[in-house]
Amino acid sequence: MRLILLSGLLLLGIFLANGDEVDREGKVVNSLIDALMHLQREFAKLKGSFLIVHKARSFGSGSERMYVTNKEIKNFEALRQICEQADGHIPSPQLENQNKAFANVLERHGKEAYLVVGDSANFTNWAAGEPNKAAGACVKADTHGSWHSASCDDNLLVVCEFYFIL
């Protein structure tokens, strides 16, 4: 919405900077208002389309979170930077259906990936004998969604988590 308002102000500023005659009949202002209303309608359509796609993807995975890979293989620190740059997060499944959606990505690619486990996690999916701190300070998920302790230096599939507050 701010972008639309700024666009309208920019158009008005361009008109005034050109030194054109004063718009006594308000034609320019009315034209700007029409353009602004058009931009608002287009923005509403785009927002609606985005929400439809998001809801469809959420319905298909059973999760309000999306897990996406760029197919790169990186260590934990590189993953953190990549997800941060993409405005995403390192996967942190909080529910069984989220873990299943995450595991579906891993199964499709036949690879393991890092995840983070919060201190107050109500949901966990540790494999038998895990967590095993001797194996490392990080956590990885296998293609079945089971969690294992891992070295943070392991090179695993890059998967970032994206979620939306609707």
UniProtKB/Swiss-Prot annotation:
Glycosylation sites: N122
Entry's localization field: Secreted
Domain C-type lectin: 46-161
Cross-referenced Pfam families: Lectin_C (PF00059)
Extent of the signal sequence: 1-19
GO cellular component: extracellular region
Ubl conjugation listed as a keyword: no
Protein name listed in UniProt: Phospholipase A2 inhibitor A1
Organism: Bothrops neuwiedi (Neuwied's lancehead)
